[in-house]
Amino acid sequence: HGYAKVIMKNSDPMTGIHIDIGNPKRLIFTESPIDLMSYYELHKDSLQNVRLVSMDGLKESTIGRHLSQIQAEISGQPLRWTPEQMADGLQVAIDHHFFEDGKNADLITLALDNDKAGRTFIQELEAKGAVINSDLPELRPGQDKTDWNDALKNQQEEKSDNSRLAQARRKLERLRGEQDEAISRAYSHQA
C-alpha cells in the first residue's frame, strides 16, 4: 500500500509535529504524524519525559533542531540560534563530542519505518558519529517494509483474534460439558 509523506499545513519543514509527555529529557522521532500517533498508542504506558517528533520524512535538520531545543530547555539556558543553526544542531553536537564515550546515548531514538530508507538513514547518522537508538517495527514473514501504523493495526488484529479464540474455547468447554451430561444421562437410562 502507499504511504503519505507530506509536510502538514502549519508545520515548519524543520520542526515537524511534536508532542511533549512530561518534562522531556529525550527525543523519539518518527517519519510521519500517523506513525507518531501509532507509536504513542503502542508505547503510551512506558513513555515518560519524552518529546515525540514527526519529521515529515527523514530529516537530519528536524533532529538537529529538536536536539538544540531540548538541550537548551534541560540546561535552562535561552537558545539564541537561528533556525538554520538549529537545523545543523546534530552535526554541531557531533563536532563538539556530545556523544563521545557513551555520553547522551539515550537521548535520541529513531522510531522509523522498517524499510531500506529508514535503516540507511540510521546507518548514515551513526557513520557521522551520532549515537542513535533505533526502534523499528518488527517485520512479519514475507515483508520487506513496515511502519508503526502497520504495527498498531497488526496488534489490534491479534487482540481481536485472541478474544475470538477465547470465546471459541469457552464455547467448546460448554459443549463438552453438555456432551458429558448427555452421555451420563444416556448411560443412566440403560442401567
Regions found by a protein language model. Name each.
Residues 35:
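Conserved Rossmann-like nucleotide-cofactor binding loop
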Residues 23-27, 106-109:
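Short active-site oxyanion
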Residues 31-32, 114:
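Helix N-cap/beta->alpha junction signal
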Residues 43-191:
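TOPRIM fold recognition
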Residues 1-21, 45:
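Basic, glycine-enriched DNA-binding surface that flanks or lies within the catalytic cores of DNA
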Residues 7-9, 30, 84, 88:
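Conserved phosphate-coordination/catalytic loops
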